[in-house]
Amino acid sequence: MKKVYLLAILAFLCADATAQGINFLYNDIRQAFNLARAQRKMVLVEVYSKSCEHCAAFEPVFKEKAVGDFYNQNFINYRLEVSTQDVQRFLTPKKLFAPSLPLFLFFDSNENLQHVAIINSTASELLRKGQEALTPNARTSNFRSRYAAGERGDNFLFDLAMYCRVVCDTAFNIKIMQEYARRTPVAAYSDKTNWLVIQKLLMDADNPMAKYLINNYSVFKTKYNPNEVKFVAENLLMSSLYSSRGARYDAAQIQQIRQGLVKIGIGTESANARTLLPEINYYFSKKQTDKAIARTEDYINNTKPQIADYKYIIGLFNQRATDKTYAPALKKWVNKALTLTTPNSPDAQILKQELAKAQR
């Protein structure tokens, strides 16, 4: 009993003390869970940023009496700022990711994630999501079983896809969004709802909606903020290329990424450079040294590689090529690289050593 009393006093001292509204704790998330166990409550963790305008829009909502009464009665409430050590200490070990801010995470007192919410800044939405967190069947942690049982409503799929993003279940997110894209009319891909879907939920450049975005880029730029459209399209392409899925891409798929980058206004030189390593590594894995040479020649002849670029590529050929047919081309690359440095520089010495390896 004494322990519960002391925890309550400590919570009061650490809380955001307001006459009404949600009482948030700060700075010690472990203390929040200790208090939750003592009071047999769940924990709401709001992940936010001090520089986030959408986060700031929730401030007056948090201060509403009805909101405060509900959350203070049912939850221990904690605010986690994304720039603090709480992210590394709490979210990262649990493999939790914040794809959008603010993010509302509801945990049981043993730190098990039960519910996820990304919502508009209204009291009704905040109260509704809190009530869902208190209702076991409504929690996002139970959505997989509901999906397995056949539930397929649009809003349900959206919530499940976001939950998958938060818990880093990329494979399930891709499956869900492929299903949604297949049943959605193509003519609706660029409407406001699906633009939000593309922005917030898609993780795969191979999704039909992602391909539509790339191939109809001008349509989206006309309807929505051009900078946001470019950011979303570029992120889809690059995150897919350098994901675990991207590591399994064949040459044609990598070339599609390169073409996609050009379509959205990334310069041809930059698109060439960004896709070089994945493509030549694919050729190395297939023992296609000739194609790796040709792709590298394309890069060197059409971009402006620096000395560091030459050193890396030359070293990579020495490490990964399965035959010595690349040696004549490598000699040519070394000679080009040497024009970018002084004869006896450390870089020149490294390049000459790499050439000697290739010629053995």
Predicted features by range, described:
Residues 1-23:
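Bacterial Sec-dependent N-terminal signal peptides
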Residues 39-52, 315:
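Short active-site neighborhood of thiol/selenol oxidoreductases, capturing the structured segment around
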Residues 39-43, 73-78, 101, 109-112:
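Loop/turn elements at helix/coil->beta-strand transitions in domains of secreted/extracellular proteins
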Residues 63, 98-142:
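Non-catalytic, surface beta->alpha helical segment in thiol-disulfide oxidoreductase systems
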Residues 148-360:
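Oxidative protein folding and maturation machinery
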